[in-house]
Regions:
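N-terminal acidic, glycine/proline-rich low-complexity segments
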Residues: 1-243
Length: 243
């Protein structure tokens, strides 16, 4: 219900506080050449994931989850044995493991917790109920002050630039880099920029609050080891594709 109410407000509101007018948002989207995708038939995400796992070697797959966990939870619900057989670890961007509560606001809607968790609490609960599944979590605090995207405005024909413009709607293209940092960790190429907590277990309560316990479990938290500036410079360099 919360999910439906949130997206109803997102899609049908005439304007968004701090985001700009809705017509501008849709005008930008319409300029991104989406016509060629309209007649495509897309398979369910669960089917695509299961097929990819079936074709993979045992313990060779890193699953990256930078949004809601519904697709991963769906696979675990119906194909748990396959998931454990093929997956080496799951890297997730979610949660708020600091001692304070961060409050979001959209119109008259308030909620506390982290966005990816709150929008589908049950799926996150399903994922983290798997205490023996290796799961590494980068919470939003790790990327909140790592800003990237400032150089994209000058990059013509850059799909990342188009995505940032559509998302930011007339604002500065600089934005927090939590998702990209999770991707960097998952790729292993940037492993020296991160550190890991001891192993333990992560739980999610019905309000979306995330808690880490160092008791039993195969979960761990990802911390940034490099400083804020190093991350921002690295990510901005990655964005500068050749055109």
């Amino acid at each position: 219900e919360f999910y439906e109410e949130f997206y109803a407000k997102f899609h049908y509101a005439e304007s968004f506080p701090g985001w700009g007018e809705k017509p501008t948002f849709y005008k930008i989207l319409n300029n991104l050449n989406l016509e060629k995708y309209k007649n495509e038939v897309y398979r369910a995400a669960k089917e695509v994931i299961v097929e990819a796992l079936e074709k993979s070697e045992d313990k060779s797959v890193t699953v990256l989850c930078i949004g809601q966990a519904n697709n991963v939870a769906d696979v675990l619900s119906g194909n748990s044995a396959l998931f454990y057989q093929k997956v080496k670890r799951v890297v997730v961007m979610c949660g708020n493991f600091n001692d304070y509560e961060y409050e979001y606001r959209l119109g008259d809607m308030y909620w506390k917790g982290e966005f990816n968790v709150i929008l589908d609490v049950k799926s996150m609960q399903k994922l983290f109920a798997e205490k023996n599944l290796p799961v590494c979590v980068l919470d939003f605090n790790q990327g909140f002050d790592v800003l990237s995207g400032e150089g994209l405005a000058a990059q013509k024909d850059n799909p990342v630039r188009d995505a940032y413009i559509a998302h930011k709607v007339g604002q500065s293209l600089n934005m927090p880099s939590w998702d990209i940092m999770a991707l960097m960790f998952a790729s292993r190429e940037f492993g020296n920029m991160f550190s890991l907590s001891e192993k333990g277990s992560i739980s999610v309560d019905d309000d979306g609050k995330t808690t880490f316990s160092s008791e039993s479990g195969e979960h761990c938290l990802i911390y940034r080891k490099a400083d804020q500036k190093a991350f921002s410079e690295c990510i901005n360099e990655l964005f500068m594709v050749k055109v």
